[in-house]
């Protein structure tokens, strides 16, 4: 198993973003979806992305956004990765000519492998819990046994992760990365720095244990 990658999503302040980076986050997520309590303005996002340093991946999360809006964000905010969390097509995702991660919501009847195959150009696939009408950030987990075990695609696990369960999640799924938002907050959009530290510590310990077993 390769080294685990950790993304802290839904950041709304530079203070919280820097705390995530200091704790060991590989990536931070900026939400450009107005209905979300974690949504940021372009100005907020620009300040955060410019303030986290060059070695942390600034990720922009969009949900079925108008292409013109995405382009306007890209013109102002130095994003290294786009995350599409709606029903975007492969052609849409590829149209921005940027690395992208496609979120797949784990509906009960979903053929996960087939859904992943629809986005062969994605840099990673994010698997998130499903709740009708809610594109993400539900705070709910899903059956980790549904995560494909034999794939060359980088898989990122999301959905209800927290310091208390991330180690079990990693042990069960052996994913490329984990993505957390609500599980490290004191209120929607307000990160708890101690929870971030615990989450990352627990995640890295679980990953190290798997690596020590030669998996």
UniProtKB/Swiss-Prot annotation:
Substrates-to-products reaction catalysed: N-(5-phospho-beta-D-ribosyl)anthranilate = 1-(2-carboxyphenylamino)-1-deoxy-D-ribulose 5-phosphate
Pathway(s) of this molecule: Amino-acid biosynthesis; L-tryptophan biosynthesis; L-tryptophan from chorismate: step 3/5
Entry keyword set: Amino-acid biosynthesis, Aromatic amino acid biosynthesis, Isomerase, Tryptophan biosynthesis
EC number of this enzyme: 5.3.1.24
A Gene Ontology biological process term: L-tryptophan biosynthetic process
Enzyme class: isomerase
GO MF, one example: phosphoribosylanthranilate isomerase activity
InterPro entries in the cross-refs: Aldolase_TIM, PRAI_dom, RibuloseP-bd_barrel, TrpF_fam
PANTHER family: N-(5'-PHOSPHORIBOSYL)ANTHRANILATE ISOMERASE
Homology family: Belongs to the TrpF family.
Name by which UniProt lists this protein: N-(5'-phosphoribosyl)anthranilate isomerase
């Amino acid at each position: 198993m390769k080294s685990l990658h950790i993304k802290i999503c839904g950041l709304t302040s530079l203070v919280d973003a820097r705390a995530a980076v200091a704790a060991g986050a590989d990536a931070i997520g900026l939400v450009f979806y107005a209905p979300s309590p974690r949504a940021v303005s372009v100005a907020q996002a620009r300040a955060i992305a410019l303030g986290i340093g060059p070695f942390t991946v600034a990720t922009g999360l969009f949900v079925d956004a108008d292409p013109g809006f995405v382009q306007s964000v890209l013109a102002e905010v130095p994003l290294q990765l786009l995350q599409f969390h709606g029903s975007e097509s492969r052609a849409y995702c590829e149209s921005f000519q940027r690395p992208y991660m496609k979120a797949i919501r784990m509906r009960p009847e979903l053929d996960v492998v087939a859904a992943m195959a629809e986005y062969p150009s994605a840099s990673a696939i994010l698997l998130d819990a499903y709740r009708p009408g809610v594109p993400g950030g539900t705070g709910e987990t899903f059956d980790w046994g549904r995560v494909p075990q034999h794939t060359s695609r980088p898989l990122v696990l999301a959905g209800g992760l927290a310091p208390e369960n991330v180690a079990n999640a990693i042990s069960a799924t052996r994913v490329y990365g984990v993505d957390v938002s609500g599980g490290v907050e004191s209120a929607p959009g307000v990160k708890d720095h101690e929870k971030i530290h615990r989450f990352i510590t627990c995640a890295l310990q679980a990953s190290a244990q798997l690596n020590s077993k030669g998996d």
